[in-house]
Structure formats: C-alpha cells, structure tokens
C-alpha cells in the first residue's frame, strides 16, 4: 500500500514538473507591476487558475499563474493588476481584456455564474484566468473590466 502511495505521489510530481516545463517560455511575456501608480479600484479575491482559451482543463503553470492563492485585483488604465499572495504583481494588458462569468474551471465548480472569467493576451497566447470575488458585485466587476478594455481600444 505504501509503495502504491509513493508511486502515485511520484507520478503527480512528475506530471506537474512536466506541465511547468512545457510553459516555461511563457514567463518572458509577463508585465510586472511596479506599484508606482495608484490603482483606481481594488478587489479582494481568490485566484483559481488560468487555462488556455477554449481549453478549460489545460492549466497554465507558469510564474504567479501556477497556484491557487488569495489575491487582489486592481484596475488601472493600462490593465488589470493581479497580485497573488507570495508572488510579484502582474499586469493583464487592457488591450484584449474581456470579462465574463463562469460556473467551473480546472478543479473548481461553484454556483451558476459564480466565477469571474477574464480572457487576456499573454504574448502570442490567449488565456483565461478565473477568480472567486470576495464581497464584490460580480456584475459590476465584469462591466468595469470590459469598460477598461473598450477605453484602451478607443
């Protein structure tokens, strides 16, 4: 029984390591937030995960997108700032941002439309990040992100 558990843990470790290695070149496309400018709004949330657009079970495992964490989202004219606990803050560029609602992703299912889904561009890749908001009106957040994207495109 112990050998079976050790084999399962080794398989999980090997799979996670392989996934992280397959996304290692994506890290060069991150824009890190320097924190010099003030955010227009801040929201506490739980960062759930990021997947490739259209592939909701394909977790993107690179840098601050690798693990679920308590986080803060901030609105800024240049984009949406994601500050996950224990990681450097990154900017999801306003150009190409699109927000909506979701019920499930990777390993999380909630009540209907209970997750915030943000589609954004990471270098040449289109990805979708999912968040569980804390004490925030989800509809207002979706509208604010979509307005930010429209302002940037205008």
Regions found by a protein language model. Name each.
Residues 4, 39-40, 65-67, 74, ...:
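A generic structural signal for short, solvent-exposed coil/turn residues
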Residues 18, 96-154:
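Acidic, Ser/Thr- and proline-rich intrinsically disordered linker/docking segments
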Residues 54-56, 82, 88-90, 122-129:
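Short, surface-exposed beta-strand/loop "edge" segments at domain boundaries and coil↔beta transitions
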Residues 12-72:
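Anionic N-terminal interaction surfaces
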Residues 3, 8, 32, 150-154:
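Intrinsically disordered, low-complexity linkers and terminal tails enriched in Pro/Gly
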Residues 65-106:
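Phosphoinositide-binding peripheral membrane targeting modules
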Residues 1-17:
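Alpha-helical transmembrane spans
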């Amino acid at each position: 029984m112990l050998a079976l558990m050790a084999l399962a843990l080794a398989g999980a470790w090997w799979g996670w390591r392989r996934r992280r290695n397959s996304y290692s070149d994506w890290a060069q496309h991150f824009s890190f937030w320097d924190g010099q400018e003030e955010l227009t709004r801040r929201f506490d949330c739980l960062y759930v995960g990021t997947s490739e657009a259209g592939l909701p079970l394909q977790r993107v495992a690179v840098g601050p997108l690798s693990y679920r964490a308590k986080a803060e989202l901030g609105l800024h004219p240049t984009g949406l700032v994601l500050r996950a606990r224990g990681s450097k803050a990154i900017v999801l560029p306003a150009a190409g941002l699109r927000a909506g609602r979701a019920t499930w992703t990777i390993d999380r299912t909630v009540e209907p439309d209970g997750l915030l889904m943000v589609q954004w561009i990471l270098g040449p890749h289109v990805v979708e990040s999912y968040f569980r908001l804390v004490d925030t009106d989800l509809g207002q957040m979706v509208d604010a992100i979509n307005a930010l994207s429209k302002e940037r495109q205008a």
